[in-house]
From Swiss-Prot:
Gene: carA
EC number: 6.3.5.5
Keyword hit for Cell cycle: no
Species for this entry: Ruegeria pomeroyi (strain ATCC 700808 / DSM 15171 / DSS-3)
PROSITE patterns: GATASE_TYPE_1
SMART domains, sorted: CPSase_sm_chain
Protein name as annotated: Carbamoyl phosphate synthase small chain
Classification via NCBIfam families: CPSaseIIsmall, PRK12838.1
Location of region: CPSase: 1-194
Purpose of the protein: Small subunit of the glutamine-dependent carbamoyl phosphate synthetase (CPSase). CPSase catalyzes the formation of carbamoyl phosphate from the ammonia moiety of glutamine, carbonate, and phosphate donated by ATP, constituting the first step of 2 biosynthetic pathways, one leading to arginine and/or urea and the other to pyrimidine nucleotides. The small subunit (glutamine amidotransferase) binds and cleaves glutamine to supply the large subunit with the substrate ammonia.
Length: 388
């Protein structure tokens, strides 16, 4: 079923079931195929598009006004956009923000990302919920010429994210040190001066703001590629190990990540902290399992309950897989749970400073309710040193 309210659309989004959404194209021209998700955040579209966790996905923004504050290099979560494409309600207006360095349209075009505006995003979001993150093809042609049969075939031919190890595509090529802290007015980004803890961060697709939060918590951060071995991690003599966010199927990434994590847990007593994909990697290493969600959690307004304190945190989330809490073995405690659907959002080992959360405590975009987790990681390293 096609929806074509325009006399000459220049872009179209084609779902695998044959549904077509027409609109106005912007950004790069061409076509791409991916899994379709929706994000409910009102701000932070630049951080979302550059979040490595969105590899292999086209993002539908439910908030209608996207692009009105432009983009600035300071807000990139990685060097280039990683999300495969963008779907918005309204065609972006001119940027109005003192920090804006570039218009969204030009930024997307320069970075090779396709976008479509003028789409009924409420109807599309309903389709995503009903179909469960459908496979889609997105095309942008200034002449408005589309081969719908070929686009439907392309959408149906997309393999999907299950079984895909995308961390290898977005991880760093070699190790590096990170010392930039969180943005603060009026200084901007400052460099740390006297870090207390040596931390090795495994980069499955790490956001820059996660690394900044670690640095702001007193961590001297060395980032290693996703395929780093336990020996390579321990060669840096860390006080703690951090497992980052990232894209794809955790079971696929776990083929090489889980053995490394298990060796760290079996041979050391180091504190370990994981976020998002890192949370899933830790759960797999401890004997749990992960499952594909219907349409995932993507937004900056997700309520999560801390099961140990009873407090509710409003969190930022971006994941299409979840840890099956029923699969967690003895000695692993579920600590956080989504108040939207009851899915697992946090675990810890009962006798060791090893913990992780499914959501993003660094936010960017989103609320700052959960920054205490970085401080908890630093406190665990302090306590570990005091015992030596």
């Amino acid at each position: 079923m096609a929806q074509n309210p325009l006399s000459k659309p220049t872009a179209c989004l084609v779902l695998a079931d044959g549904t077509v959404f027409y609109g106005t194209g912007f950004g790069a021209t061409g076509q791409t195929v991916a899994e379709l998700c929706f994000n409910t955040a009102m701000t932070g579209y630049q951080e979302i598009m550059t979040d490595p966790s969105y590899a292999g996905q086209i993002v539908t923004f439910t908030f209608p006004h996207i692009g009105n504050v432009g983009v600035t290099p300071e807000d990139d979560e990685t060097t280039d956009p990683v999300a495969a494409g963008m779907v918005v309600k309204w065609d972006p207006t001119a940027a109005s923000n003192w920090r804006a360095a570039e218009e969204l349209k030009g930024w997307l075009a320069r970075r090779g990302r396709i976008a479509i505006g003028g789409v009924d995003t409420r109807r599309l979001t309903r389709a995503i919920r009903q179909q469960g993150a459908p496979h889609v093809a997105l095309a942008h042609d200034p002449e408005g010429k589309f081969d719908l049969a070929a686009l439907i075939a392309a959408a149906r031919g997309f393999a999907g994210l299950e079984g895909m190890d995308l961390a290898k595509d977005v991880t760093c090529a070699q190790s590096y040190r990170w010392d930039e802290m969180r943005w603060a007015w009026p200084e901007g980004y400052a460099r740390q001066e006297a870090p207390k803890h040596k931390v090795v961060a495994i980069d499955y697709g790490a956001k820059r703001n996660i690394l900044r939060c670690l640095a702001s918590s007193g961590c001297d951060v060395t980032v290693l590629p996703a395929t780093a071995t336990a020996a390579e991690v321990l060669a840096h003599a860390p006080d703690g190990v951090f497992l980052s966010n990232g894209p794809g199927d955790p079971a696929a990434t776990g083929e090489y990540a889980v053995p490394m994590i298990r060796e760290i847990l079996d041979t050391t007593s180091l504190p370990v902290f994981g976020i998002c994909l890192g949370h899933q990697m830790l759960a797999l290493a401890l004997g749990g399992r992960t499952v594909k969600m219907n349409h995932g959690h993507h937004g900056a307004n997700h309520p999560v309950k801390d099961l140990e304190t009873g407090k509710v945190e409003i969190t930022s989330m971006n994941h299409g897989f979840a840890v099956d809490a029923q699969s967690l073995p003895e000695g692993v405690v579920e600590t956080h749970r989504s108040l939207f659907d009851g899915s697992n959002c946090g675990i810890r080992m009962s006798e060791r400073p090893v913990f992780s959360v499914q959501y993003h405590p660094e936010a960017s975009p989103g609320p700052q309710d959960s920054f205490y987790l970085f401080e908890r990681f630093a406190a665990a390293m302090d306590a570990q040193k005091a015992e030596v």
